């Protein structure tokens, strides 16, 4: 598939999960705090919310800076969130999408599962694991 006359995009995908010692309500609410994304998603430098379902994220990948408009596509409270980048002037030749799921555990913990698909390059699997570890540290203190 060619996009804007560029070479075909290579898509990378990865999935990871982690158990966090906090209730699903607390974990979900913390993930919804978009302004905290740079604290655990190291590729995001800052986030600006546009409306209830859209925000612009300033990203840094492989020594390059991008701004990407993201759309929240699915929001099932305390269960699942899904988002994707929109094709726009910010990053016309790149695409990313993600789904994060929250599963309550019997010991008041929460299993967080993150799936990412990206054309921004780099090792998506190592980023997923790192983002989850960072998020766990942020939530658990």
Predicted regions and their residues:
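Hydrophobic ligand-binding cavity/cleft-lining segments
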Residues: 2-56, 134, 138-140
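Beta-strand/loop substructures that line and gate deep hydrophobic ligand-binding cavities in soluble
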Residues: 5-8, 66-74, 82-141
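Residue-level marker for the onset of beta-strands and adjacent loop->beta junctions
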Residues: 14, 43, 55, 68-69, ...
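Short beta-strand-to-loop capping motifs
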Residues: 20-22, 59, 116-118
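Short strand-connecting beta-turns/loops that link adjacent beta-strands
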Residues: 23, 52, 77, 105-108
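Alpha-helix boundary recognition
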Residues: 32, 73-76
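Short, hydrophobic/aromatic-rich segments at coil-to-beta transitions
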Residues: 49-56, 76-84
């Amino acid at each position: 598939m060619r996009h804007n006359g560029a070479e075909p995009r290579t898509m990378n995908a990865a999935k990871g999960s982690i158990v966090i010692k906090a209730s699903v309500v607390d974990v979900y609410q913390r993930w919804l705090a978009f302004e905290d994304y740079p604290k655990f998603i190291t590729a995001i430098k800052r986030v600006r919310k546009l409306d209830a379902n859209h925000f612009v994220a300033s990203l840094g990948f492989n020594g390059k800076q991008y701004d990407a408009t993201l759309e929240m596509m699915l929001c099932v409270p305390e269960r699942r969130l899904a988002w994707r980048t929109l094709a726009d002037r910010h990053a016309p030749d790149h695409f990313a999408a993600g789904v994060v799921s929250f599963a309550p555990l019997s010991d008041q913990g929460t299993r967080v599962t993150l799936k990412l698909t990206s054309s921004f390059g780099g090792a998506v699997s190592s980023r997923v694991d790192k983002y989850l570890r960072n998020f766990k540290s942020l939530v658990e203190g």
